[in-house]
């Protein structure tokens, strides 16, 4: 359970706040916690404070339009690389899928918003990028961001480089 927070509450005006009976965490009308809000805003300092106070890095939004979104989805959607890095460092699930109609990963969210650097960051940090990754509508991230083809090409090059350098022996650094 979160302790008292020095981070100022910034729920949207005219939105109702509710306290989850299960977790005791304040949420806005979108079902977002303070960590969701600060991750979406790209407020690195506030995100760090909230995580230091015990906020759940993989908290799921419970609103009707954002069901299952994690703070990482929202940071990716906003293209906030430093916040994404901190969330991943603290254990955020890069493959978390929304539970609404789409079933998006943070990679889908970044691609949809055309946040190329966020896409590059996620792929560079191991985001799952198989040929068949799709949302529940069977759309791959490339469907939302046609500039994403480069990520598939980079993955292919990396795969080829790894297999060429390894040959039939185990991969190890040369002495």
UniProtKB/Swiss-Prot annotation:
Interacts with phytochrome A (PHYA), both in Pr and Pfr forms. Disruption phenotype: Normal hypocotyls length. ANK repeats lie at residues 30-59, 67-96, 102-131. GO terms for molecular function: phytochrome binding. One of its GO terms (cellular component) is mitochondrion. It comes from the Eukaryota. Pfam families: Ank_2. It comes from Arabidopsis thaliana. InterPro entries: Ankyrin_rpt, Ankyrin_rpt-contain_sf. The keyword Endoplasmic reticulum does not apply. This is Phytochrome-interacting ankyrin-repeat protein 1. The lineage of its organism: Eukaryota, Viridiplantae, Streptophyta, Embryophyta, Tracheophyta. Keywords: ANK repeat, Cytoplasm, Mitochondrion, Nucleus, Repeat.
